A protein has these predicted regions:
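Structural core segment of the AMP-binding/adenylate-forming
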Residues: 23-103, 428
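Conserved ATP-binding/catalytic segment of the ANL
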Residues: 130, 330, 337-397
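Conserved pre-ATP/AMP-binding loop-to-beta segment of ANL
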Residues: 93-129, 136, 159-165
Length: 500
C-alpha cells in the first residue's frame, strides 16, 4: 500500500519500475516529465511516497531535503540508490545479489512467478497527478478496476498480436500513453520500442518507417504536423483541387494520397488512435476523404482515460465515437442532438476520487455517481458524441453570446503561416494570439512586417467565415510556442491577460 513515485522520460527501466511496484502491491505515482523540481517536490510530499525512481537528468535539479518523507531515491539508469534513509532498505540494496542468490539458488524459474493478487478491484493502483489547462494539479486515484477495464477495452477493439511492434512515444506518466502503448501492448505480448525523448515529427516518422508499428496512439499535434508538412502540400494547389473534383481521377488521387500517408506512418498499422486534444477539422476531413484508418478517442485522466471511442471503419466525421464498453455517457442538455451540454459519465473506468481532496471530488462526481467532465458536446441518435468545446474555455460576451474558441482556432490554424493560435476575450472583444510558422515564413523570404500583414489578411479572411458576434478584432503575434500540457493542450490560463 505504500506509494512509490517515478519520474523520467519513456524507457524500458520506467516500465520495469512500474511493474515491480504494482505487482509488489504498492501504489505507483507517475510524475509527468514536464513537471519542474518544485512540482516534483510537492507531488512526492503530497502523495507521502516512500521511494522515488528518477532519471539522472531530473535528479540533477532535485533537492532531497525538500522531500523529507522519502526513505530512498533510486536512479532509473541502473537502479542505483543515491539516497537511502532507512537501515533495512540500505541492507537490501547493499546485499541484493546475496539475497537474490539465497532465495533462488538455482536461478529464477517460471514456477517462482507469483504475482500478488489485489484484494479487491477497488484497491488503489495508481495516483496520477494531472497537468491540466487550468493550472491546478490534482492526484487522480485509479483503482485496479479502472486499469483492467481500459486495457480490456483495447483488447476488445484492437488487433495486436504477440510479436507485433508498438512505438511508445506518448509520455508514460500520462494515462493515455500508460494504457494504450504500455499496459495494453505489454499484455498483448507486443515488442515495445520506447522513444526516450519527445522527438520531432521527422524523428517520429523515421521511427515509424523502421519499426512499422501495428497500432499508433498519439496526440493530434503530431498527426497534424506530419500531414500538413508531408501530404497536404501535394494537393493544396489549383491543379490538385481541380483533379479532386473529377470523379475518375479523384479515386486515383485518393488512393495515392492514402498510400503516401500510410507510408509516412509505417504502412503496417491497423489504425491510428488520436486523443488528448481537439483535432484539426481540415486535417480530419482530408483523412476521412482518402479513407485513412484513424479514430478519435475521448477521455480524461479521471477515467483512466477512455470514455468514448469507435473503430475507424464506423467513426463519424468530427465525432469521438460512442461510449466504450462498461461506460455510460449522457449529455446534460434538454436537446442533446442540437444543443450542446456537459458530458457526464459513469462506469468501470471511473476514478475513486482525488487523493486527499474530498471537496474537489464532490465537485466533479455527483451524489448519483456521475462524473461531470466539463466538456460540452452533442450526441446523435446513434450515440455518437461530438465535442464542441470545454465549458471553462467558453467565452461569454456582454451581449450574452456563447463563443467556443476551439472552433475558431481550428479554422485559424489552417490559414497561411499559422502554426497555432489562441482566442481570448479582451474588453469584450475577441483577440487572436498567433504563433506563426516562422521557419516556413523565413524560408519563403518573408520579414517580420510581411508576417504581420499575412496575419492581418488571415484575420480579415476568417471574419468573412464567422458570424458577427465571433468577429476577431485584433491579432497579436506570439513569438514562442504556447506552453502545453503532456497531452499537447495549450495551458490557456497562462494567456488570459493580453498585453499590447
Amino acid at each position: 500500500g505504500s506509494e512509490m513515485c517515478i519520474r523520467d522520460s519513456n524507457s524500458a527501466h520506467w516500465a520495469v519500475a512500474f511493474l515491480a511496484t504494482v505487482t509488489y502491491g504498492a501504489v505507483i505515482v507517475p510524475i509527468l516529465h514536464e513537471f519542474k523540481a518544485d512540482n516534483i517536490h510537492n507531488i512526492v510530499n503530497h502523495s507521502e511516497a516512500k521511494l522515488l525512481f528518477v532519471g539522472d537528468r531530473a535528479w540533477e535539479n532535485l533537492n532531497e531535503e525538500a522531500m523529507p518523507l522519502l526513505m530512498g531515491i533510486v536512479l532509473l539508469t541502473d537502479f542505483t540508490p543515491v539516497v537511502c534513509r532507512n537501515e533495512q532498505l540500505m541492507e537490501a540494496f547493499e546485499h541484493r545479489n546475496v539475497l537474490y542468490g539465497t532465495r533462488f539458488p538455482k536461478n529464477f524459474r517460471p514456477e517462482h512467478i507469483s504475482y500478488r493478487k489485489e484484494e479487491s478491484p477497488e484497491e488503489l493502483a495508481v495516483i496520477n497527478y494531472t497537468s491540466g489547462t487550468t493550472g491546478y494539479s490534482k492526484g487522480v486515484m485509479l483503482p485496479y478496476r479502472s486499469l483492467w477495464s481500459n486495457v480490456a477495452y483495447c483488447h476488445e477493439m484492437l488487433p495486436v498480436r504477440p510479436g507485433d511492434h508498438i512505438v511508445s512515444m506518448l509520455p508514460l506518466g500520462h494515462v493515455f500513453g500508460m494504457v494504450y502503448d504500455f499496459l495494453y501492448g505489454f499484455s498483448a505480448g507486443a515488442h515495445l520500442y520506447f522513444l526516450t525523448r519527445m522527438p520531432s515529427p521527422k524523428i517520429i516518422a523515421q521511427s515509424f518507417s523502421e519499426i512499422r508499428p501495428r497500432i499508433i496512439s498519439c496526440v493530434p499535434l503530431i498527426v497534424e504536423k506530419i500531414i500538413k508538412k508531408d501530404i497536404l502540400p501535394r494537393i493544396d494547389n489549383k491543379i490538385g483541387k481541380l483533379l479532386l473534383r473529377m470523379p475518375i481521377v479523384n479515386d486515383k488521387i485518393k488512393a495515392d494520397m492514402r498510400k503516401k500517408a500510410m507510408e509516412v506512418f509505417g504502412s503496417n498499422f491497423d489504425e491510428i488512435i488520436i486523443g488528448g486534444a481537439p483535432f484539426n477539422a481540415e486535417v480530419e476531413r482530408f483523412l476521412k476523404q482518402i479513407g485513412f484508418p484513424y479514430t478519435i478517442a475521448y477521455g480524461m485522466t479521471e477515467c483512466g482515460p477512455i470514455i468514448c471511442s469507435s473503430r475507424w471503419e464506423t467513426l463519424k466525421l468530427a465525432s469521438c465515437g460512442k461510449a466504450t464498453t462498461r461506460m455510460e455517457v449522457k449529455i446534460d442538455s434538454p436537446d442533446p442532438q442540437n444543443v450542446a451540454g456537459e458530458i457526464i459519465c459513469k462506469g468501470a473506468n471511473l476514478m475513486l476520487g482525488y487523493y486527499k481532496n474530498a471537496e474537489a471530488t464532490s465537485q466533479i462526481i455527483d451524489v448519483n455517481g456521475w462524473l461531470h467532465t466539463g466538456d460540452l458536446a452533442t450526441m446523435d441518435t446513434e450515440g455518437y458524441v461530438t465535442v464542441r468545446g470545454r465549458s471553462k474555455n467558453m467565452l461569454l460576451t456582454a451581449s450574452g453570446q456563447n463563443i467556443y474558441p476551439e472552433e475558431i482556432e481550428s479554422k485559424l490554424n489552417n490559414m497561411p503561416y499559422v502554426s497555432e493560435s489562441l482566442i481570448v476575450l479582451q474588453n469584450d472583444k475577441l483577440v487572436a494570439l498567433i504563433y506563426p510558422d516562422f521557419d516556413d515564413a523565413f524560408a519563403h523570404g518573408m520579414e517580420q512586417s510581411d508576417i504581420e500583414k499575412v496575419m492581418e489578411d488571415n484575420r480579415n479572411e476568417l471574419n468573412l467565415q464567422l458570424p458577427a458576434y465571433c468577429q476577431i478584432t485584433k491579432v497579436k503575434i506570439h513569438f514562442e510556442e504556447f506552453e502545453k500540457t503532456a497531452k499537447k493542450s495549450i495551458k490557456r490560463f497562462m494567456y488570459q491577460e493580453v498585453k499590447g
